[in-house]
Amino acid sequence: MEKKKMGLLVMAYGTPYKEEDIERYYTHIRRGRKPEPEMLQDLKDRYKAIGGISPLSKITEQQAHGLCEHLNDIQDDIEFHVYIGLKHIEPFIEDAVADMHKDGITEAVSIVLAPHFSTFSVKSYNKRAQDEADKLGNLQITSVESWYDEPKFVDYWVKQVKDTYASMSQEERDSAVLIVSAHSLPEKIIAAGDPYPDQLAQSAKMIAEGAGIEHYEIGWQSEGNTPDPWLGPDVQDLTRDLFEQKGYQTFVYVPVGFVADHLEVLYDNDYECKVVTDEIGAAYYRPEMPNAKPAFIDALATVVLKKLDESK
């Protein structure tokens, strides 16, 4: 029996490929407004601090291709063909959809490399893909909206947290708190009924319960540079407050809203949060990110197949 041919659209935020890309990338994030020279320099300095341009583009490719290969290995009905679509740099989401159309793909499934749904992120990615497909015609896209509660994904983090706690001394474990975080978004999303904060709270609860961790807190990180208020508390402020008010001496950070080693994790956690823990004399731990680890790729494949099953 001939396999059905299907597009696999993997969408992500995107990252500069080289230093010369930083300005146009940042300009795209700012909706066409060029950043002030000091803002641009600040971003360049952050990339320098993590050892140069973020590894995110390579990791995204490994995740997307790994997912496609794994999907083709674990079932025999569909032959998946992968396309990467990025939000803020080429190949843009629209480019990926146009390529699928050009290759004669009439059916596709899409997934965003962000576990929680929000109108700001996942909804906008899916809309861009859908709008382009509608414009081109004869291409139907089934979109995954969120996958934070996929048991295999939760298990990935449970295992990482357990391993991290097992690596600590008894003294560190006794004074430890788990901080589960995601990318902050403008507070106005709450008034609009966005499920994003609730989904993060559910993630934190599932991971903490699964790993048998009693003391855990929810934080937000990497907020944008705009006058609007953003969701808080910020992870750095939260770290200080927890130290001062509850006396924790060991901080374990799980940035569950992200899936790879990139600027928000390597700088905002490993540098900025560590500055705080060093300042207060506390221990800093951050379990490994999923990147393209087989357990994570398998979790994503399960999500995709479940979605296709649901939409039959």
Swiss-Prot record:
Entry's Gene Ontology molecular function annotations: ferrochelatase activity; metal ion binding
Enzyme class: lyase
Amino-acid positions noted as binding Fe(2+) in the UniProt annotation, renumbered to this chain: H183, E264
SUPFAM superfamilies: Chelatase
Positions with a binding annotation for Fe-coproporphyrin III: Y13, R30, R46, Y47, S54, Y125
Enzyme Commission number(s) of this protein: 4.99.1.9
PROSITE patterns xrefs: FERROCHELATASE
Keywords: Cytoplasm, Heme biosynthesis, Iron, Lyase, Metal-binding, Porphyrin biosynthesis
A GO CC term assigned to this protein in UniProt: cytoplasm
Pathway where this protein functions: Porphyrin-containing compound metabolism; protoheme biosynthesis
Top-level division of the source organism's lineage: Bacteria
Biological function: Involved in coproporphyrin-dependent heme b biosynthesis. Catalyzes the insertion of ferrous iron into coproporphyrin III to form Fe-coproporphyrin III.
Name of the protein: Coproporphyrin III ferrochelatase
Organism of origin: Bacillus pumilus (strain SAFR-032)
